[in-house]
């Protein structure tokens, strides 16, 4: 499943394609959304927001399209008139004079009023977004030590969108490798230095991934600015200590870690 950085980059691409441009055609696959098609013609997208792994497309008439890609949903940007060759099922089409955005395969799609936006079950449940520039390590530390989360093992906590929105499996393993911890630790057991390092890594690594993953620095031997240290690298030597990276399962998800420097 795409994680927060990937969802945010998708939102950036959608905004760049159609933000501020009048919609010339709107189509929804689901019957309950059909009445909104005519309401959106002539309106425009004001901005595209992310809340963790959910994407909110805001329109100039104050309606908001909520979508959660889950495992299979994917957005595409195409030139208007282009019909991509795909076996995926089209769910949403928002067309402007020159660009069209298409949502395929997603099933969790709703149209929300401003009032519904404040009471939506998923949006109420998610914690602060790791890509929100206003979220600080101090606030993250407070959440780590709160009665709700301090007794939770990191293996499960770092996948829980109620703790911090936008984290997922690759971020979970990369963050824990960065701070040298295994997934069975709890916040209540950390010393001050470990807690501080974790609070910073929980923000820095997702933000670095969002900003640089896929970009290349020709002065770096390995190329990409953001690259995995342990994720999908089982059987390879750890770049920090040389031990062999291992793979196991924690909280029903693949977990990659270094037994030499994660304790």
Swiss-Prot record:
InterPro entries: DNA_glyclase/AP_lyase_DNA-bd, DNA_glyclase_Znf_dom_DNA_BS, EcNei-like_N, Endonuclease-VIII, FPG_cat, MutM-like_N-ter, Ribosomal_uS13-like_H2TH, Znf_DNA_glyclase/AP_lyase. GO terms for biological process: base-excision repair. It holds the Pfam family H2TH. One of its GO terms (molecular function) is damaged DNA binding. Changing residue 174 to Q: Loss of glycosylase activity. No effect on AP lyase activity. DNA binds at residues 70, 125, 169. Changing residue 160 to N: No effect on glycosylase and AP lyase activity. The keyword Metal-binding applies. SUPFAM superfamilies: Glucocorticoid receptor-like (DNA-binding domain), N-terminal domain of MutM-like DNA repair proteins, S13-like H2TH domain. Disulfide bonds: none annotated. The active site is at 2 (schiff-base intermediate with dna), 3 (proton donor), 53 (proton donor), 253 (proton donor). Involved in base excision repair of DNA damaged by oxidation or by mutagenic agents. Acts as a DNA glycosylase that recognizes and removes damaged bases. Has a preference for oxidized pyrimidines, such as thymine glycol, 5,6-dihydrouracil and 5,6-dihydrothymine. Acts on DNA bubble and 3'-fork structures, suggesting a role in replication-associated DNA repair. Has AP (apurinic/apyrimidinic) lyase activity and introduces nicks in the DNA strand. Cleaves the DNA backbone by beta-delta elimination to generate a single-strand break at the site of the removed base with both 3'- and 5'-phosphates. This is Endonuclease 8. It comes from Escherichia coli (strain K12). The gene is nei.
